[in-house]
Design a protein with these regions (language model features):
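Repeated loop/turn-to-beta-strand initiation elements of outer-membrane beta-barrel proteins
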Residues: 203, 228-230, 257-263, 292-298, ...
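Membrane-embedded beta-strand positions of outer-membrane beta-barrel proteins
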Residues: 230-232, 251, 263-267, 296-300, ...
């Protein structure tokens, strides 16, 4: 039975927590930080993977709007009229934003060809903005008045129907548009992305004329390949003291409520140790459901570890970390080349550390943080950029337990204020006679406060700076890393060799006694697929730059294999 170390018995730990930690703190804090960083990175990658694949299926518009194209000259005509005002009207308020789009052509002489030219210009602007069934018409008028009037006739959605009505799906939860709404391509694409984010589900859309003028019927053909999907994974991303080789099982359950919802579960465990006192395991569950332009997601996980420590007498160090996160994402703006969303999160974590089944009460943590952010995806030629800018703040509420000494006398605090930037840029590059791919991934956090180890930024390992094993890391209250990778896909053989160079840097009050602040590493590897179910990634990394005295292997092998079913 575990015994909790109460406050009266932990005075020594409490008085030295902010300056010179005891042996117990030395053993557990760095390790938990390292393991928590690895677990958080893997959870983040699993959460992002399905959405990334769905979004990349979108195609860009070939239309160029007036705002992004150079202004074209009016055609010269013998019969023309002086026009001082160009008026654009519509029965729908959404088109009021176009009322000044042609004002640059005012105070010119315009004839019949000029009217047709301007009508075409405005029509192309509507197409570029996604109003693919709305029309620009020229009503009867007298140009001697000095005014030229265009009218935008809105195109509407008459109905949205499933071509296979027996499909286990509700399109209303995915699409931010209903019958009677003005038809806009971006709203339909948002619904398609929401439906494609469901594993094993694909959708094709056609727009057909409706039964009334300027009305269209949107037909959806949904292909569903089962409602349960899974994968088995094996890698060597673990720690020597708790299990280098990690095995994982992932299961996803789609359409439980028929709302394009997804329940994802995973179980990860070391397969290196059995009954020798070492080991680690992790459970994770997440559930997401769309609501048109909004997506709700809740996730929870629990991570635990055991290890034997010899300092100099043997004892068992163990710990648990569990967390719950609730997130809401709202699309703010979507064009043919970009999507911008607002994100809000509430994050709660609990951590407990033990020595020989005795809980170190002073190290127990119950923390809560709120986060707001902006995410942006941009398409530019053959380049796709994803950026997420966030602000996160620890709060004293919603289950958090804040101690009175936090933040005093250089002690760390859970009531931190932090900003961060993360994302990736992917673009095609020529490599000899073949088309290659360059990818830059980056992540950062910035604060001027001293943080607990589990909130610090960690570098060194496959999830940050490759070329390092992750057994030893550099940590700081603030930091960043950038991963650069050049890949050359051989699509016929389903093999992609790659080479990478990564850099990371940390700083802040907690780095005062650290060996250094910067790591640079390199990696060469190959990833690919075998058939439709097996994926693999094998690489060899090496340190390029590290602080003197920083202990790490000169060659770091990494592998990951998975089987999908």
């Amino acid at each position: 039975m575990r015994v909790v170390c109460i406050a009266a018995g932990c005075v020594g730990l409490l008085t030295t927590f902010g300056t010179m930690p005891t042996i117990a703190a030395k053993v557990s804090n760095p390790f938990i930080q390292q393991e928590a960083a690895r677990a958080d990175a893997s959870l983040r990658q699993r959460a992002e993977a399905p959405m990334t694949g769905a979004a990349l299926l979108r195609s860009e518009s070939t239309y160029v709007g007036l705002s992004s194209a150079p202004m074209k000259a009016l055609p010269k005509e013998e019969i023309a009229f002086p026009i001082d005002h160009i008026i654009i009207t519509s029965s729908e308020p959404v088109f009021r934003k176009y009322k000044n789009r042609l004002e640059g052509y005012e105070h010119n002489r315009i004839g019949s060809n000029g009217v047709t030219f301007l009508q075409k210009q405005l029509q192309e602007q509507l197409l570029a903005d996604g109003y693919v069934t709305s029309q620009v018409v020229v009503p009867n008028q007298d140009l001697h008045s000095g005014s030229l009037i265009f009218e935008i006739l809105p195109g509407y959605v008459e109905d949205i129907v499933l071509t296979n009505p027996k499909a286990r799906i509700n399109w209303r939860s995915a699409f931010p548009v209903r019958p009677g709404y003005v038809l806009r391509r971006q709203a339909l694409e948002q619904g398609i992305d929401q439906m494609r984010s469901v594993p094993g589900q694909d959708i094709k859309m056609t727009i057909e004329p409706g039964t009334k003028p300027l009305h269209s019927i949107v037909k959806l053909t949904v292909e569903q390949k089962g409602f349960v999907h899974g994968s088995l994974m094996l890698d060597n991303s673990g720690n020597k003291s708790t299990g280098m080789y990690q095995g994982a099982v992932f299961l996803s359950f789609s359409q439980l409520a028929g709302l394009n919802d997804v329940l994802t579960t995973s179980f990860t465990k070391d397969i290196s140790h059995h009954d020798d006192g070492h080991g680690s395991k992790q459970y994770a569950v997440s559930y997401s459901v769309p609501d048109g332009n909004r997506t709700y997601r809740i996730s929870t996980y629990k991570y635990s570890y055991n290890q034997l420590v010899f300092m100099p007498n043997a004892f068992r160090s163990s710990g648990t970390t569990q967390g719950t996160e609730f997130a809401v994402e709202q699309v703010l703006n979507r064009t043919s080349r970009s999507k911008t969303s607002a994100v809000a999160k509430v994050i709660h974590k609990e951590r407990h550390n033990y020595l020989d089944d005795v809980e170190l009460g002073v190290q127990a943590q119950h923390t809560t943080a709120v986060e707001v952010g902006l995410s942006h995806r941009q398409y530019s030629g053959n380049t796709v950029s994803d950026v997420y800018l966030f602000y996160r703040q620890g709060i004293n509420g919603l289950g958090a337990q804040v101690r009175s000494w936090e933040g005093l006398s250089d002690n760390p605090t859970t009531l931190y204020k932090m900003a961060g930037l993360e994302g990736q840029v992917q673009t095609g590059v020529r490599m000899g006679y073949k088309q290659g791919m360059y990818t830059m991934r980056f992540r950062s956090q910035f604060t001027d406060q001293r943080l607990f180890g589990t909130e610090q930024f960690s570098i060194g390992g496959r999830y940050s700076v490759r070329g390092f094993s992750g057994e030893e890391t550099l940590r700081g209250d603030s930091g960043y890393y950038v991963q650069n990778e050049w890949a050359l896909p051989f699509r016929k053989q389903q093999v992609t060799p790659y080479v990478g160079v990564d850099i990371g840097h940390v700083w802040g009050p907690s780095t005062e006694t650290q060996l250094g602040n910067t790591l640079v590493g390199g990696v060469v590897g190959v990833r690919g697929t075998v058939g439709d179910a097996v994926n693999y990634d094998v690489s060899l990394g090496t340190p390029i730059k590290k602080p003197e005295g920083f202990d790490t292997d000169t060659r770091v092998w990494a592998f990951r294999g998975s089987y999908q079913f």
